[in-house]
A protein has these predicted regions:
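Amphipathic, Lys/Arg-enriched alpha-helical "gate/interface" segment within cytosolic domains
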Residues: 1-131
Length: 131
């Protein structure tokens, strides 16, 4: 399951469960339509806490989607996860798509303020990795 919400900072994406290629393609198409009306610069918050590891065919669609968000004006993004495998997958995808330097990863199991931490990165450039 996925959901895309528009927020004052940009887009809040929620993914949960097992995302097959067909559903990922639906997300991709919906994202393309939304991005046609996107502001020049925006952030993306991705809540993946309840998502299962992505199959390879879904990963490739996600990679194309991330490229589109970046090309349409994404300046920063944050990914919130609860599991090691999806964390590794999304770091690899971000490196492949060229957005790694603008993306931060938050482990919700060890950061109780994961949502506030993520929004602070998107809106105010407060880096959650800076200690």
């Amino acid at each position: 399951m996925y959901k895309i919400e528009q927020k004052d900072f940009g887009y809040y994406l929620t993914f949960s469960g097992f995302i097959k290629k067909e559903e990922m393609e639906e997300w991709y198409k919906e994202s393309l339509a939304l991005l046609e009306k996107a502001p020049a610069h925006f952030g993306v918050f991705a809540d993946l806490r309840d998502m299962k590891p992505l199959p390879a065919e879904s990963q490739s669609v996600m990679e194309e989607g991330q490229k589109n968000y970046k090309q349409k004006g994404m300046v920063r993004s944050v990914v919130v996860l609860n599991s090691a495998i999806p964390t590794m997958q999304f770091k690899r995808i971000a490196k492949t798509t060229g957005i790694y330097q603008w993306e931060r990863y938050i482990d919700a199991s060890s950061n109780k303020d994961w949502e506030a931490t993520g929004i602070a990165w998107i809106k105010d450039e407060i880096d959650p990795d800076a200690k």
